[in-house]
C-alpha cells in the first residue's frame, strides 16, 4: 500500500471517529436533556392541541344542553395554585337532582399536551365520544385538566388533582355530585395519574413519600380504570422513556428511588380500589399490575386483547367502541365491572 493511500485511509478513519463522537455526544445530550425532544414535539403539536400551562380557560365557559341531551358545565376553576386548573362536569340529562355515581376522568397526552376539551394527541381514537357514552350509562362525569411539562414535573399533577378532589368535595352539593361513590379513570398519561392516585389514597406510605395528604378517603373510591398506563419504567421503549423520563426529571436516566416513586405497582396492597385494566400498547404494564392485584387480593378485571384474541390493538383502543367490536366488548366489560362497584 502506498503512503498516499495509507494517509487517505488514516484521514478517513479520523473523520469517521469524529463523526461518531459527535453523534454519541448528541445522543447523550438528548437523552439527558429530553425536553429538547419533547419541546420539538410540543411545537409541532401546538396548532392542534393544547401544549401550554395557562391560567385562563381554553374555551368560553358555558352551561346548558348538548345536542345529545346531556347537560354540561364547562371551565370550572378548581384551584388558583396551578395553571390548567379547570374541569368540566357532564350529567346524563338535565335532571341533576338524580343521585348518580361520579366518574372523574384524566386525559392522556404524554404530559406534554392534550386537554379535557380534545383528549389525547397520542391516541388514535375519539376519547370525547367515549366520555359521552360513559356518562350515558348513568354517571356524572368530571373531566379534569392538569399541568404539563416543561414547567411542571412529577408529582405536580398528582398534587393538583388532589386539589380538584378537594374542590369537588367542597362543592358537591352545588354541583349535585355524589362524592361517596367515586370512580377514577384515565387514559395513557391520565391512567398513570389515576393509578398513582389510587395508591396515594389507599397507601399512607406512598402518599408520604410523595408529600401528598389525600383529600379522598379509600372508602369513597369505589373503582379505578387504568386505560393503557405505562408504569414499569425498566420495560419501556426508548420513546416512552423519553416522555416519562422527561416528565419525572428531564432525562431518561432515572435512579432506583425515582422509579420506586413513579411505579405505584410496587405500592399496591389489599386496600387498592377494585380495578379495570385495559392493555394494548402497554399490555406488559397492565399484566404487571394484574399480578400485583392478584397478590393483594384486589377485585379487578384485565382486558387484554392480545392474550384473549391474539389481537394487537392500538393505544387506548377502548375509545373506538362506537366503531370497533373488540373495543365495544372492552367498553361493555369495563362498564359492567364499575357498575357493580358503585351499587
What are these regions (language model features)?
Residues 7-343:
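Alpha/beta-hydrolase superfamily serine-hydrolase fold, recognizing
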Amino acid at each position: 500500500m502506498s503512503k498516499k493511500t495509507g494517509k487517505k485511509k488514516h484521514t478517513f478513519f479520523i473523520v469517521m471517529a469524529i463523526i461518531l463522537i459527535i453523534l454519541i455526544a448528541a445522543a447523550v445530550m438528548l437523552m439527558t436533556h429530553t425536553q429538547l425532544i419533547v419541546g420539538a414535539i410540543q411545537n409541532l403539536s401546538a396548532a392542534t392541541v393544547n401544549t401550554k400551562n395557562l391560567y385562563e380557560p381554553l374555551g368560553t365557559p358555558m352551561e346548558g344542553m348538548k345536542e345529545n341531551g346531556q347537560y354540561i358545565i364547562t371551565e370550572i376553576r378548581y384551584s388558583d395554585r396551578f395553571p390548567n386548573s379547570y374541569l368540566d362536569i357532564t350529567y346524563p340529562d338535565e335532571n341533576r337532582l338524580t343521585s348518580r355515581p361520579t366518574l372523574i376522568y384524566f386525559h392522556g397526552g404524554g404530559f406534554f399536551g392534550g386537554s379535557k376539551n380534545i383528549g389525547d394527541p397520542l391516541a388514535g381514537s375519539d376519547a370525547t365520544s367515549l366520555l359521552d357514552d360513559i356518562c350515558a350509562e348513568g354517571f356524572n362525569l368530571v373531566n379534569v385538566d392538569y399541568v404539563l411539562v416543561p414547567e411542571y414535573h412529577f408529582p405536580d399533577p398528582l398534587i393538583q388533582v388532589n386539589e380538584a378532589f378537594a374542590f369537588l368535595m367542597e362543592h358537591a352539593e352545588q354541583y349535585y355530585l355524589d362524592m361517596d361513590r367515586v370512580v377514577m379513570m384515565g387514559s395513557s398519561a391520565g391512567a398513570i395519574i389515576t393509578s398513582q392516585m389510587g395508591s396515594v389514597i389507599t397507601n399512607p406510605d406512598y402518599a408520604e413519600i410523595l408529600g401528598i395528604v389525600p383529600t379522598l378517603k379509600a372508602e369513597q373510591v369505589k373503582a379505578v380504570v387504568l386505560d393503557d398506563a405505562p408504569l414499569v419504567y425498566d420495560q419501556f421503549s426508548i420513546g416512552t422513556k423519553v416522555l416519562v423520563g422527561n416528565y419525572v426529571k428531564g432525562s431518561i436516566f432515572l435512579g432506583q428511588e425515582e422509579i420506586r416513586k413513579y411505579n405505584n405497582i410496587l405500592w399496591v396492597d389489599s386496600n387498592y380500589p377494585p380495578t379495570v385494566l385495559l392493555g394494548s400498547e402497554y399490555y406488559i404494564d397492565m399484566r404487571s399490575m394484574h399480578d400485583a392485584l392478584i397478590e393483594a387480593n384486589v377485585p379487578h378485571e384485565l382486558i387484554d386483547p392480545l392474550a384473549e384474541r391474539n389481537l394487537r390493538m392500538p393505544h387506548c383502543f377502548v375509545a373506538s367502541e362506537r366503531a370497533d367490536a373488540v373495543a365495544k366488548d372492552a367498553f361493555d366489560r369495563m362498564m359492567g365491572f364499575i357498575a357493580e362497584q358503585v351499587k
